[in-house]
């Protein structure tokens, strides 16, 4: 539109104005998960460990922004008949390989659990009822790739119930 709006478009109401442009970059990383299942009682116990890590630099040597930090994920699950229990710990490392305009994101540990009972409704479908707890350590955790990580942390300790019906 015309020039009658003058400089008002130069003001961004304290928001960051960024122009993202393509640059040559090199990404290096890996992701793996190992696990083992054991018979225990009349059910199965599964233990697993996973890790992922990504490093990314532009060809001039500065860091690509919004790259998630390395994570270690420990998991334990037990399944017996119509019951399933799962406990997981996500250990997210500090991200200090930051790009232009970013800030360091602290490490955190996220402990989650879930207990699910499945009801077979004799040809009328299947009902799963779960109770869960998330962020049981009540960590202040921030998503490094979020543009609003300073203002909006991840959810604190919370509990809930979930009902799922398949027909």
Regions found by a protein language model. Name each.
Residues 39-57, 114-137:
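Long, low-complexity, intrinsically disordered polar/charged segments
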Residues 3-96:
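Gram-negative outer-membrane beta-barrel transporters
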């Amino acid at each position: 539109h015309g020039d009658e709006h003058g400089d008002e478009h130069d003001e961004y109401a304290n928001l960051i104005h960024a122009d993202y442009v393509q640059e040559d970059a090199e990404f290096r990383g890996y992701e793996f998960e190992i696990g083992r299942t054991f018979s225990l009682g009349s059910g199965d116990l599964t233990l697993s460990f996973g890790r992922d890590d990504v490093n990314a630099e532009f060809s001039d040597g500065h860091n690509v922004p919004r790259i998630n930090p390395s994570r270690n994920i420990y998991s334990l699950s037990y399944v017996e008949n119509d019951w399933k229990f799962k406990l997981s710990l996500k250990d997210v490392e500090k991200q200090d390989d930051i790009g232009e305009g970013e800030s360091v994101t602290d490490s955190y540990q996220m402990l989650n659990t879930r207990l699910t009972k499945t009801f077979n409704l004799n040809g009328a479908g299947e009902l799963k009822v779960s109770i869960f707890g998330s962020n049981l350590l009540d960590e202040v955790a921030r998503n490094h790739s979020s543009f609003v990580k300073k203002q909006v942390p991840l959810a604190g300790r919370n509990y809930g119930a979930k009902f799922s019906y398949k027909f």
